[in-house]
Amino acid sequence: MILVNDGEILTPVLNLNMLVEGMYDPNSQQTVSDTVRVYLRNINSPFQIVDSAVSVFNTSGLASLDFQNVSDGINYYINVVHRNSINAWSKSGGESFSSSILNYDFTNDSSMTYGYNVIKKGAKFCFYSGDVDKDGAVDLSDLSVIDNLASSFAVGYLNSDLNYDLLTDIADLTVADNNAFNVVTVISP
């Protein structure tokens, strides 16, 4: 819902801080910029989508997303979808906008992600990488895709390139293999 305050139009904005495991370098505390889609969902089952937005997160992991169909004071789950990471949800109970602003940081504490479904790199928490086929789990099917593309020296903006060096190789396979071994899956309400 777009609010009007003394003639000024206030579009609800979510200021999001998030990091993706394969793209984050804890030594430089920088990440590679990439596109992310964020859904705001009802906090009651079946968790219907209320609104969505797309943005690019910057090298610090920050993204600012404008929404049209949300209201202040109503709790929403924040559901983050990235091209090659496990989809993540905000903590149990949801979050609400106040004065058309919601600031949310997934990186400082694992409790900010539903089911604590993040991995710690350095001092920050990141979404797990490796779900290249977006089936909700890092598993053999993801490893097969990465392995096949690595063996053909695939280059470019590919879901299989987990560290975004524009080359699918053993570095990407290692990240996915570790997460498959640990049975990493989406944890949602």
Where are the regions a protein language model picked out?
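Structured interaction patches on ligand/partner-binding surfaces of diverse proteins
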Residues: 1, 56-57, 85-117
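Low-complexity, Pro/Thr/Ser/Gly/Ala-rich linker/spacer regions in secreted
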Residues: 3-14, 126, 187-189
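Short amphipathic, basic-aromatic surface patches that mediate peripheral association
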Residues: 11-31
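Short coil-to-beta strand junction motifs in C2/discoidin
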Residues: 28-37, 73
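Beta-strand signatures of extracellular beta-sandwich domains
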Residues: 35-41, 77-79
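Short, acidic Ser/Thr/Gly-rich low-complexity loop/linker segments typical of extracellular
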Residues: 44-62
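Short Pro-Gly-centered beta-turn/loop motif in secreted/extracellular proteins
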Residues: 61-76, 84
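Alpha-helical segments with a strong preference for the paired helices of cellulosomal dockerin domains
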Residues: 110, 114-119, 132-159, 163-189
